[in-house]
Amino acid sequence: FKFTYFVDKKSPVTKLSFPMAYDCSFEGTLDGDNYRFVLGVKVPVTTLCPCSKEISEYSAHNQRAIVKLKVNYDRQKYSIWPEDMIELVESCSSSPLYGILKRSDEKFVTEAAYENPKFVEDILRDIVVKLRKDKRINQFETEIEAFESIHNHNAWAYQSEGVKNNETTF
C-alpha cells in the first residue's frame, strides 16, 4: 500500500510551518504463523560534496538526494512511525529539506550543509549504523541517489541487512 504522508515541518530560523510530503508504503505478508510487516519511506535530503569543499576557495557543490528506506519490524512488540524513519534519515544527511524557506532559513541550511559535507556513501553508512543499533528493527534496506549538479551521472549507494532473527534477505 503506497501513500503520501504529510509532516508539518518548521523552517529552521523563521519557524514557518509548512507540510512536507513524503512517499511511504506499508507491505504485509502472512505465511502460516509468520507475519511480516515492512514500512517504507522516501526522504529527500541535501548532500554537499566533501571533495568540492576541500578544493574550492569559496563554496562547494551540493545536490538533492532521495533516500529510500524499508524496515521490517515486529508490529506486535514495537511501533515505528514514518516520522521516526524520516528523522533518522534527515539526521544523517548534510541537511534536511524544508517546504518553505525565507532568506535567513536558506542561509542557515546552506551553511549547515557546508559544515556537514557528505558523500552518498557517508549518508548511507550513518543510516546503517543507526539502524543496526535500533532494537526494534529486524531487517532493513536502504538506498540513496544524489542528483548530481555538476556531473553527468548520479551518485548511488545501497545496503540491505538482516539484523536480528537470522533474517538474511529482504
Q: Language-model segments: which ranges?
A:
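N-terminal intrinsically disordered, cationic/polar leader segments
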Residues: 1-170
